[in-house]
Amino acid sequence: MNGLVLGATGLCGGGFLRHAQEAPQFSKVYAILRRELPFPATDKVVAIVERDNSKWSQLITNEMNPQVLFTALATTRAAAGGLDKQYKIDHDLNLQLAQAAKEKGCETIVLVSSAGAHPDSRFGYMKMKGEIERDVIALDFKHIIILRPGPLLGERTNSKQSGFGGNLTAALGTRVYRSRFQRLLGYPVYGDEVGKVGVHLALNTSGKDKVQFVSSKDILDISASLEKIAT
């Protein structure tokens, strides 16, 4: 089985890549990126660096043959230069690449969305995330796993990629992480946990609903269960 990771230089995408490369079910894990990986990878990982993301769909080939697509591909309004430009990355590029992967036989997609995502939201960010979810579901993959994390924690390689809530929320999130106050801040979660849970769910789809929505609390609970099994 081969996997494909988009957004592998980010918190969640990096988590996808690290945990997918450790899973024996994957023979190869491809990553399409604009820059080199910021962390070491095993020989199982094939990193394809192409700065022009308009060419990315052409890189998803029959030879790659990804059975699972993990996408944490996203930017921020500040990094993109406005919501319209952010939409072209977060929504349009994600959909284009998901469609390309499906045409090459991909059956499972794992999408990082956001807590509060809804296509009818009054808030631009939540509306965009909801529209991504809606349109990914419409592509009709065999298995669709939508992760909805709250504030993301972890060390970022790009200061502009502050994501949900920005640096202040992340700082507060670290303080309440897995505490009795975590609900007040939307269950902050580490990007690596999001990646770990996404890989686990992608490899365990038997008997599950075609479309799975996984909340931030669910991610924390599943991650904790996996840690107990590992020890």
Swiss-Prot record:
Keywords for this protein: Membrane, Mitochondrion, Mitochondrion outer membrane, Transit peptide
Disulfide-bonded cysteines: none
Pfam families with a match to the protein in the record: HIM1
InterPro entries registered for this protein in UniProt: Him1/Fmp52, NAD(P)-bd_dom_sf
Domain of life: Eukaryota
Entry GO terms, CC: cytoplasm; endoplasmic reticulum; mitochondrial outer membrane; mitochondrion
Keyword hit for Mitochondrion: yes
Keyword Membrane assigned: yes
Membrane topology field: Peripheral membrane protein
Transit peptide limits: 1-44
GO biological process terms, semicolon-separated: import into nucleus
Compartments, as annotated in UniProt: Mitochondrion outer membrane
Further information: Present with 1340 molecules/cell in log phase SD medium.
Protein name in UniProt: Protein FMP52, mitochondrial
Organism: Saccharomyces cerevisiae (strain ATCC 204508 / S288c) (Baker's yeast)
Record gene name: FMP52
